[in-house]
């Protein structure tokens, strides 16, 4: 029998061994069945885990998500460790069957948010560890099922806020770790009912102040005695940008000289140790209203916006009091914003009066009044010459609603009125309106449109026929917000008077005028093109003028360089060769001198050196002789060497003198008006100028045919 029991025991052990997942260690002999799968390189939760497991450790693996079936039917599981994995998603109701779970470790994963049903069913959970994740959002109902929590660790995340309402309900909570987040505010009264709280860590957040709470008074006992007991409380708030004013005076009065918290503001206390600052330096600045609306006049039915701004330390809260002395809060016709602006959506005649703006903080309060005048709409006179004013009804502007309600959520009437009027299209200067309301008002004469801009309190009126379904508003300013209302002017059947009724109001903003910028750019572009074209034309004209000047100069230079090549002229008196002398032949004389040769030419030879020595050439006292000029001039260039040697002989002085006399006589007879003038210059007075153009050219010599001169002289004597 004993052997049989032993065999059964071995079979049971073998069966249990087969249930244990691969790579995991199962402690089946311990009173509490434990499955240890830490650091096994698992990519998912093993599916063959014993459902009776009490402790399951899956830390330091590579599990990426948790599915609904992973922990199904594990009703005995008490401790679940999923730390240091790569979990980024948990299926809703994934832990719903773990009704006996006491501790859930999800630290050091990649969770970014906690949804509503992630922790559903964990009614007995005591320890929830979520530190070192990437949490940015926690749903407002995420902790509704974990009200029995004793420890909640949300440190080292990116949280700006947490569901404080859910925290208030965790009456068993004794440790709350919120350090190293971005929390900037803790609502007042959050810890009022957490009497079991023994430790609160809000280190390294963005808190500027801590709300006073009786819970924090127990922190002084821990600081002075150093003994942790159920009645003591450990508070850690270092690393926050504390604003050291009168709101933290209660905290300064606690004796915690062992901590090193510092102040970040105001400027006089920046960087100083919190516990070393005297209490009298924790000051607050009373509020001061710096800007507010002094007076406003609006038309009946128009929207009125009253502004009030104040400064102080701490930031003052702003409230409005109606002319009737009632506190104004969000209602059907009024909206109060956090920045101190009061917005009356549709004004009535009873809204006329003085509204009071009250700015208050712990240091005091300040008040200012704003006068609001409601302009009555024009009405026609009846037969008795009395103006009928329809009753605007009782004002509900001071009707209180739930405090702290969202201004935008109580805008039902405005939304309905905006549905009646729609801006179909809005440009920078126009807006197309469409009317969707039903014309069920009998006796409508016309519709009146009233509008004004954000920066202009002047109302603009437009009258349109009652059959109009659209209307185009012109001459609007670009980038401006407009408040527009449509009123129906009709005949009241009861009083037989003309009455008005607000049909609806709407607010719209015109577009920015980008077209104007493009127009300016096109203007600049056109001007630039005109300048460029004009410059091209001017440059072309200048180039044309320069070309003409260069061409004219070249022609003149070519005319000056055309010098007639003539033979050297030798004086028949002394036979000396005359060089560099200028010869001037008038046109009539040249024609007579070339009488026997039709192709002869006469040129003017002018030398710059001869001009420089003109004084010597023109001397009357010097003994000069004239050279005999033959009737024909020949160039020295084509003359052969033999001819040069012939002309090189020096004739006697007497025949030359006679030849000159005969030539002069002949010229006188042939031309009565012009005589041949020969300017002679001594050889010694001729110098060659260095800058003259003819200085580098070989001087042309004038050669005289002596034989022809002698024959001509004899012919003249015979005559």
UniProtKB/Swiss-Prot annotation:
What InterPro entries does its record include?
Answer: FN3_sf, Ig-like_dom, Ig-like_dom_sf, Ig-like_fold, Ig_I-set, Ig_sub, Ig_sub2, Leu-rich_rpt
- Tell me where in this chain the LRRNT domain is found: 18-51
Origin species, per record, is Mus musculus (Mouse)
Q: Which residues lie on this side of the membrane: Cytoplasmic?
A: 551-719
What are the subcellular locations of this protein?
Membrane
Q: In which tissues is it expressed?
A: Predominantly expressed in the brain, with a weak, but broad expression in the cerebral cortex and diencephalic nuclei. Strongly expressed in both the pyramidal layer and the dentate gyrus of the hippocampus. Also detected in other parts of the central nervous system, including the olfactory bulb, pons, cerebellum, and medulla oblongata, as well as in the peripheral nervous system, such as the ganglia of cranial nerves and the dorsal root ganglion during gestation.
Where are stretches of biased composition, namely Low complexity?
393-412, 614-627
Chain's role: Cell adhesion molecule that mediates homophilic cell-cell adhesion in a Ca(2+)-independent manner. Promotes neurite outgrowth in hippocampal neurons.
Residue intervals of the Ig-like domain: 287-373
Pfam families this protein is in?
Answer: I-set, LRR_8
Q: Which ranges sit in the Extracellular compartment?
A: 18-529
Q: Which residues cross the membrane?
A: 530-550
Q: How does this protein sit in the membrane? A: Single-pass type I membrane protein
What protein name applies here? Answer: Leucine-rich repeat and fibronectin type-III domain-containing protein 5
Q: What is known of its domains?
A: Lacks a cytoplasmic PDZ-binding motif, which has been implicated in function of related LRFN proteins.
Gene Ontology biological process terms from the UniProt entry: negative regulation of inflammatory response; negative regulation of macrophage activation; regulation of presynapse assembly; synaptic membrane adhesion
Q: Where are the LRR repeats?
A: 52-73, 76-97, 100-121, 124-145, 148-169, 172-193, 196-217
Q: Which residues are reported to be glycosylated? A: 73, 330, 339, 382, 406, 452
UniProt's post-translational modification comment states: Glycosylated.
- Does this UniProt record's set of keywords contain Nucleotidyltransferase? no
**Feature: compositional bias, Polar residues:** 628-641, 654-677, 702-713
State the Gene3D superfamilies in the record.
Answer: Immunoglobulins (2.60.40.10), Ribonuclease Inhibitor (3.80.10.10)
Quaternary state and interactors: Can form heteromeric complexes with LRFN1, LRFN2, LRFN3 and LFRN4. Able to form homomeric complexes across cell junctions, between adjacent cells. Does not interact with DLG1, DLG2 or DLG3. Does not interact with DLG4.
């Amino acid at each position: 029998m004993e052997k049989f029991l032993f065999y059964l025991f071995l079979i049971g052990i073998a069966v249990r061994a087969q249930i244990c997942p691969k790579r995991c260690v199962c402690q089946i002999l311990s009173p509490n069945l434990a499955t240890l799968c830490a650091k096994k390189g698992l990519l998912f939760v093993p599916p063959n885990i014993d459902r009776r497991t009490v402790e399951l450790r899956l830390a330091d693996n590579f599990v990426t998500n948790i599915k609904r079936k992973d922990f199904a039917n594990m009703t005995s599981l008490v401790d679940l460790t999923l730390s240091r994995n790569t979990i980024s998603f948990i299926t809703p109701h994934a832990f719903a069957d773990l009704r006996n779970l006491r501790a859930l470790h999800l630290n050091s994963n990649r969770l970014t948010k906690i949804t509503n049903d992630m922790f559903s069913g964990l009614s007995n959970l005591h320890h929830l560890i979520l530190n070192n994740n990437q949490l940015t959002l926690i749903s407002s109902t995420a902790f509704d099922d974990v009200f029995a929590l004793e420890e909640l660790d949300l440190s080292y995340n990116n949280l700006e806020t947490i569901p404080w309402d859910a925290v208030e309900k965790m009456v068993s909570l004794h440790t709350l770790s919120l350090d190293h987040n971005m929390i900037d505010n803790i609502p007042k009264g959050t810890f009022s009912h957490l009497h079991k709280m023994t430790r609160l860590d809000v280190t390294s957040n963005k808190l500027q102040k801590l709300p006073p709470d009786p819970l924090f008074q127990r922190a002084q006992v821990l600081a002075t005695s150093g003994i942790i007991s159920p009645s003591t409380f450990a508070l850690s708030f270092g690393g926050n940008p504390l604003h050291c004013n009168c709101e933290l005076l209660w905290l300064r009065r606690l004796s915690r000289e062992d901590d090193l918290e510092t102040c970040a503001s105001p400027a006089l206390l920046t960087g100083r140790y919190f516990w070393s600052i005297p209490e009298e330096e924790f000051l607050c600045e009373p509020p001061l209203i710096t800007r507010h609306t002094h007076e406003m006049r609006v038309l009946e039915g128009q929207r009125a916006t009253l502004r009030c701004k104040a400064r102080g330390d701490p930031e003052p809260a702003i409230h409005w009091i109606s002319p009737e002395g009632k506190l104004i809060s969000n209602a059907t016709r009024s909206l109060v914003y956090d920045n101190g602006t009061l917005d009356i959506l549709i004004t009535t005649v009873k809204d006329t009066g003085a509204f009071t703006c009250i700015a208050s903080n712990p240091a005091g309060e300040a008040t200012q009044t704003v006068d609001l005048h409601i302009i009555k709409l024009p009405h026609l006179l009846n037969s008795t010459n009395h103006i009928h004013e329809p009753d605007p009804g009782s004002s509900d502007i001071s009707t209180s609603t739930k405090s702290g309600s969202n201004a935008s959520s109580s805008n039902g009437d405005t939304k309905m009125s905006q549905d009646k009027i729609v801006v179909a299209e809005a440009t920078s200067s126009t807006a197309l309106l469409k009317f969707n309301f039903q014309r069920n008002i009998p006796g409508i004469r016309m519709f009146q449109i009233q509008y004004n801009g954000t920066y202009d309190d002047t109302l603009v009126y437009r009258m349109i026929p009652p059959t109009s379904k659209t209307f185009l508003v012109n001459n609007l300013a670009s980038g401006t917000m407009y408040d527009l209302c449509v009123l129906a002017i009709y005949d009241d059947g009861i009083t037989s008077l003309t009455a008005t009724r607000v049909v609806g109001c709407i607010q719209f903003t015109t577009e920015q005028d980008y077209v104007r910028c493009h127009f300016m750019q096109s203007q600049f572009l056109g001007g630039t093109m005109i300048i460029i074209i004009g410059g091209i034309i001017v440059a072309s004209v200048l180039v044309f003028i320069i070309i003409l000047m260069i061409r004219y100069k070249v022609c003149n230079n070519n005319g000056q360089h055309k010098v007639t090549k003539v033979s050297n002229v030798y004086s028949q008196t002394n036979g000396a060769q005359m060089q560099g002398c200028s010869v001037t032949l008038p046109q009539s004389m040249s024609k007579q001198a070339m009488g026997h040769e039709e192709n002869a030419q006469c040129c003017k030879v002018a030398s710059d050196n001869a001009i420089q020595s003109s004084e010597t050439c023109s001397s009357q006292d010097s003994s000069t002789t004239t050279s005999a000029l033959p009737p024909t001039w020949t160039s020295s260039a084509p003359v052969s060497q033999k001819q040069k040697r012939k002309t090189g002989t020096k004739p006697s002085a007497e025949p030359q003198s006679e030849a000159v006399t005969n030539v002069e006589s002949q010229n006188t007879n042939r031309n009565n008006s012009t005589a041949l003038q020969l300017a002679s210059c001594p050889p010694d007075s001729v110098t060659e100028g260095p800058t003259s153009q003819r200085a580098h050219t070989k001087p042309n010599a004038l050669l005289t045919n002596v034989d022809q001169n002698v024959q001509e002289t004899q012919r003249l004597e015979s005559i």
